[in-house]
Amino acid sequence: DDSADVAEEIVVTGSRIKRADNISSPTPMVTLGENQIEETGSINVYDILNELPQAGEGVSRGNTNFTVGSSGLQTVNLRGLGSGRTLTLVNGRRWIGGVPGTGTVDLNSIPTDLIERLEVITGGASSVYGSDAIAGVVNIILKDDFEGMSIEVMEGGYDAGDGDTTMASITFGASLADGRGSTVFNIRS
């Protein structure tokens, strides 16, 4: 029988992050979908995460001074333990560090238009992910089929202290090699 010799293609994918529908998980987890992210009105990942009560300001002396390589960074700081103890993943994989010599991720490097959902483990996850996940894990899931163009313009302000803000973002995306790859270009001002 020749049909017994033919192997079917088996694809196994997984994540160590428990899904939100698993309410019996002992680890506290918050999931924000695309609609929830849009409803926040936030213009970047940093502002979205800082809406969570578990997140503290990621600003520290290291990213407010004028040293090369660290000024202007926006990082996440879960449970007040410091951004160096919060692991940031993109699609379940470690993201490049924004500060040379550390694993601290600059959230400015992730275009908001491409985010499908955010998964935040707010309990310690160092036993699964290592010592840089003592405070928790932020997993940013990106859209894998973004094609076309997205234009976003936001205007805001407040009365005290000259608080007018304007943000514009244009994102282009295209599929390559019959859907096996893609390229995305984002401009933000």
Show the residue positions of the predicted features.
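Short, acidic, small-residue-rich periplasmic hinge/interaction motif at the N-terminus
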Residues: 1-38, 46
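Short, polar/charged loop or turn motifs at beta-strand boundaries
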Residues: 27-47, 66, 75-81, 105-108, ...
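N-terminal periplasmic accessory domains that precede
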Residues: 45-48, 74-77, 106-108, 132-153, ...
